[in-house]
């Protein structure tokens, strides 16, 4: 029986696991989290179950059905708290190295899997462009506000400003309201003209994305009900406070996202949640050797196959198009990975949904995609790399002194991107500042997460220890 | 207080009743409920920073909330560099502020 391993139990991975087992494979579903659902269906844990979890979710029933079906199926093994920390290619095959147990704990169980087929569904994290004061406590990524609201029922502040770009800001504002916060305003960087051109162009194409459009319309109605202003063409360009956020500066932006002088105003707030789009979690795909698209997502064909035989990809690592798209792509990927027929009615319907989703993703990008003018809200003392506290001024100085625009060499000299997050927060920003955006760039990371030396030591000796690139300390 | 948890009796999501636990944070007891992460317990108690950067001496807490940014690292029961946003709190956990992470690239 063909063994399919699926990494990631968000919408894409759940759908892939189900499609693969239905196509006759034996399936192992791994997720680093201790529950299923990924980012979209993040919910209170089983130790604190909610009576009405669906209040915070769309298609909660779909999730329940998928989760129940997978857990009940004899040919499916669901492994939660399973962190895949590296991927190797012994003899052209694929080996996943996994640690199962408490996050960052010691003495986790080590697992090595060599599947016949691999589906990567590792999702994305949100991306925040730096601005003066963004390192203050009280500044969060919008994803953090969302994760804490859904997964903890915690509101990150009382008076909260939501800012950045993209449709994601709407569910974040909604969750904050449902968690008892006051949302002072939602500031979208895209100007109304750009948004209209992106969203209203060829409206017939949107008919297929009716579910998503309805979801977004619902959020807008909710903002209006709560009298939350939604302001296009604006950004939070600075956060202020003594030790934590007390206020932010909001400014109007031009088409290029450069602040328009004289439009700045101060807004009192104790939290600000900022997201300018998403960055795919590409480590495993890059380690497997999968080709990337010019915009740095995993390149896939109509059957979600990557450029590497035996490896499929689905969900937001292949493009940012929302949960419906992730579900459809997962269905296609799982079917194909199991060696099933992607011309069956279900797989073909999913395939059509994938094409609609790609059109939707293109609209998000054209309406909300990052425009270069944001750089003009940086100051020389603005932190660019949060880990190493490297400032914009220091990055510019290094470029001037060394004459290099190569991300690698600027990182080594300025230390930007060398801290524990391994440039996950600042990597794309650095590349844009330097104009050095060729793939895989900062996305090549030998380890998906730091692993403690003790865990490495307990692994079978056949394992090459990738410690060379991470030599010091308790963790590597 | 800034960050806080939605009171169970007003929560439209209707979470199960609280099952109290206490963690020690830099020697001070902080109350939480079973199922919260360490970051969840701290934020619900209105605490938003629990790490100090070594270069700038600046306070940090949660930034990404999903285990990607490593801003939220704490020492838990003597083990450094634990991401507070991922680790579920257990009654009696001893949480200590830490400086720079030991993980270096
Ligand atoms: C914090 C956050 C909150 C979001 N909330 C919403 C929302 O409310 N509404 C909305 O429309 N969109 C939301 N999004 C956008 C969201 O990413 C997508 O709509 C959807 O979740 C994408 O599905 P996916 O299956 O591709 O990936 P995800 O749902 O991100 O699932 C990926 C899964 O892979 C796991 N994983 C990744 N790497 C590894 C590894 N190495 N080892 C083991 N497991 C791994 C992760 O733990 C995760 O569970 C959110 C995004 C983020 C980052
Ligand atoms: S808040 Fe980013 S890793 Fe915990």
For every predicted segment, state its role.
Chain A
Residues 106-117, 260-270, 307:
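Core beta-strand elements of the Rossmann-like FAD/NAD(P) dinucleotide-binding domain
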Residues 124-161, 167-172, 294-302:
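Glycine-rich dinucleotide-binding loop and its adjacent helix/turn
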Residues 65-100, 179-276, 280-281:
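A Rossmann-like FAD-binding core segment of flavoenzymes
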Residues 314-352:
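A conserved FAD-binding loop/helix module that cradles the flavin
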Residues 381-395, 414-432:
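Local cysteine-cluster metal-coordination motifs and their immediate loop/turn environment
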């Amino acid at each position: 029986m063909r063994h399919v391993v699926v990494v990631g139990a968000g919408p894409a991975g759940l759908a892939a696991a189900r499609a693969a087992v239905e196509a006759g494979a034996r399936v192992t579903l791994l997720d680093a989290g201790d529950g299923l659902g990924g980012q979209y269906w993040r919910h209170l844990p089983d130790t604190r179950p909610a009576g009405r979890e669906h209040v915070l979710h769309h298609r909660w029933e779909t999730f329940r059905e998928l989760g129940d079906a997978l857990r009940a199926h004899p040919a499916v093994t669901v492994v939660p708290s399973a962190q895949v920390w590296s991927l190797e290619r012994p003899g052209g095959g694929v080996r996943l190295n996994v640690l199962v147990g408490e996050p960052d704990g010691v003495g986790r169980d080590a697992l090595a899997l060599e599947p016949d087929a691999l589906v990567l569904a590792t999702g994305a994290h949100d991306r925040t462009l730096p601005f003066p004061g963004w390192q203050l406590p009280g500044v969060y990524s919008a994803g953090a506000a969302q994760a804490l609201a859904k997964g903890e029922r915690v509101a990150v502040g009382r008076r909260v400003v939501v800012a950045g770009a993209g449709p994601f800001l709407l569910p974040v504002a909604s969750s904050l309201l449902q968690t008892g916060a006051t949302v002072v305003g939602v500031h979208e960087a895209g100007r109304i003209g750009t948004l209209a051109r992106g969203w209203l162009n060829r409206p017939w194409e949107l008919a297929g994305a009716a579910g998503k459009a309805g979801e977004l319309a619902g959020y807008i109605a909710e903002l209006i009900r709560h009298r939350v202003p939604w302001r296009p063409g604006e950004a939070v360009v600075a956060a202020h406070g003594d030790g934590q956020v007390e206020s932010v500066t909001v400014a109007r932006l031009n088409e290029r996202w450069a602040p328009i002088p004289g439009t700045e105003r101060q807004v009192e707030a104790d939290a600000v949640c900022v997201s300018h789009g998403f960055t795919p979690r590409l480590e495993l795909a890059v380690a497997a050797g999968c080709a990337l698209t010019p915009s740095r997502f995993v390149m896939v064909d109509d059957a979600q196959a990557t450029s590497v035989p035996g490896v499929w990809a689905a969900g937001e690592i292949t493009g940012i198009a929302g949960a419906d798209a992730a579900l459809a792509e997962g269905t296609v990927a799982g079917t194909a990975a199991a060696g099933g027929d992607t011309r069956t009615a279900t797989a073909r319907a999913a395939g059509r949904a994938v094409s609609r989703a790609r059109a939707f993703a293109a609209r998000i990008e054209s309406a909300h995609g990052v425009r270069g003018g944001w750089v003009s809200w940086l100051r020389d003392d603005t932190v660019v790399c949060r880990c190493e506290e490297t400032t914009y001024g220091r990055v510019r100085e290094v470029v001037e002194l060394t004459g290099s625009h190569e991300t690698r060499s600027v990182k080594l000299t300025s230390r930007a991107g060398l801290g524990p997050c391994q440039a996950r927060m600042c990597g794309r920003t650095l590349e844009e500042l330097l104009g050095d955006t060729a793939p895989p760039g900062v996305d090549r990371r030998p380890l998906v997460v730091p692993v403690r030396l003790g865990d490495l030591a307990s692994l079978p000796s056949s394992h090459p220890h990738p410690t060379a690139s991470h030599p010091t300390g308790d963790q590597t | 207080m800034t960050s806080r948890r939605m009171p169970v009796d007003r929560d439209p999501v209707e979470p199960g009743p609280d099952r109290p636990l206490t963690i020690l944070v830099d020697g001070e007891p902080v109350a939480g409920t079973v199922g919260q992460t360490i970051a969840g317990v701290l934020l619900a108690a209105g605490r938003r920073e629990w790490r100090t950067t070594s270069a700038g001496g600046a306070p940090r807490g949660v930034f990404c909330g999903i285990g990607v940014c490593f801003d939220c690292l704490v020492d838990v029961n003597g083990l450094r560099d634990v991401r507070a946003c991922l680790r579920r709190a257990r009654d009696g956990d001893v949480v200590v502020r830490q400086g720079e992470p030991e993980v270096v690239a």
